[in-house]
Amino acid sequence: MGYKMKRITMTVFFSMIGILLAQGTPTIMRCSYMKVNKGKEAAFEKAVTSHVSRWHGIGQWNQYGWVVETGSRTGQYFVGTLGHYWEDFDERITTKEHDNDWKRISNAYVDDDNGGSGLTFWNYAPELSYNNSASSKIAFTTYHCRANALDSMLEIMVRFKEANEKAMIDVSYLVFKKEAGGPNEVFAVLALMDGYADMAPMSPSIMERYVAAFGMEVWQKDYQTWTNGLKWSETEIMSFLPDLSSTSPE
């Protein structure tokens, strides 16, 4: 959560939070990882670009793509759709041509052993998220909580947002709560970045912001709650792929 974020004016990149907030209450994101056969990445990207341009344009079902640059899934693709109501997934109507094309892409390019990366559903939490910027990269951090610790940690995220607001810190991040697809005691912080330079430590630090907003006693109490509640966390850096993504509405 201590990444330095800078706003950018490059409109070619997708502003995720703009999509989410523009649609008001639809907050559900569905996503998965795709492990492409080695040497087939360029062909896969070309095929997905064609697929998205035909079936996932403005006014159609949105689809966005990133490529993972760090961790055990380096080189895999992160593909998702967001800004939905739950019932949208029941009511969506696809064509046989669309479904066959996506099946063709999967059969031709995706590794049969796809790393167990099944579909997951996440619920965007605007009350925990902070700021709004477009981004060419994201730092996707998942926090896996111990039993009965999730609510307490999300309460800390509320105060963390307030501390950032009081400090007027120049960061941008979205918070999602996991709803389905594996263990549910999980939330994610999706930090919006320009590049790796935004991973550098910030001033004031998280502790300094928190203490300034709530005092040392609250910081120490919440730090202990966070430490006790966190089972483990993992951060993946991803680059946005505009050609593999729906065009954002103005």
Locate the predicted segments by residue.
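Positively charged n-region of N-terminal signal peptides that target proteins for export
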Residues: 1-8
